[in-house]
């Protein structure tokens, strides 16, 4: 049996050499700040690079916190260096596992994708319902995984390393999260 590393660095920027984990932490911290500035309580799965949490443990952390939304920021990589754009993954419905969070997760994914495309002008690569992701299948709370761009595309890699572009991503995700929370509150 083959298992995944508990914490992996993911892909790296083809031009910048920036590891995915470093990029996503920077965006995650900006997102935290944007949400906290609007009065939202945020629980982070990590605030530094020195973390050894599995995807199950990350989902359990969100569950234990009673999160209204679990946002798992990632960046994409591809063997095709022309691949570009953003897409958002969310859990498909699996009876007994994700059936109660699939619909709200899809709504949060729709909001996140629309906000990311509007804020950054990135190519809309759509939504992707998944049933093979541990971080989704162990989550008891709505969860989305925005892929914020392709680090294997020279142009997007440079953009993703730009602090002002990261601010746009963080603000877009904050706007989407707030709209999701408002919709859920009724």
Language-model features and meaning:
Residues 21, 38-41, 69, 84-86, ...:
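Envelope-exposed proteins and targeting segments
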């Amino acid at each position: 049996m083959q298992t995944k590393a508990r914490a992996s660095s993911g892909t790296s920027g083809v031009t910048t050499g920036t590891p995915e984990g470093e990029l996503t932490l920077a965006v995650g911290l900006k997102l935290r700040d944007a949400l906290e500035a609007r009065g939202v309580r945020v629980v982070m799965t990590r605030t530094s690079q020195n973390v050894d949490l599995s995807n199950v443990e990350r989902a359990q952390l969100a569950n234990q916190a009673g999160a209204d939304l679990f946002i798992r920021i990632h960046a994409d990589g591809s063997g095709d260096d022309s691949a570009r754009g953003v897409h958002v993954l969310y859990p498909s419905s699996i009876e007994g596992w994700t059936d109660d969070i699939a619909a709200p997760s899809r709504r949060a994914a729709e909001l996140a994708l629309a906000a990311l495309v509007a804020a950054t002008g990135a190519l809309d690569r759509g939504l992707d319902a998944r049933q093979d992701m541990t971080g989704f299948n162990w989550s008891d709370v709505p969860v989305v995984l925005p892929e914020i761009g392709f680090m294997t595309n020279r142009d997007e890699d440079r953009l993703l390393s730009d602090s002002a572009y990261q601010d746009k991503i963080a603000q877009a995700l904050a706007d989407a999260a707030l709209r999701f929370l408002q919709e859920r509150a009724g």
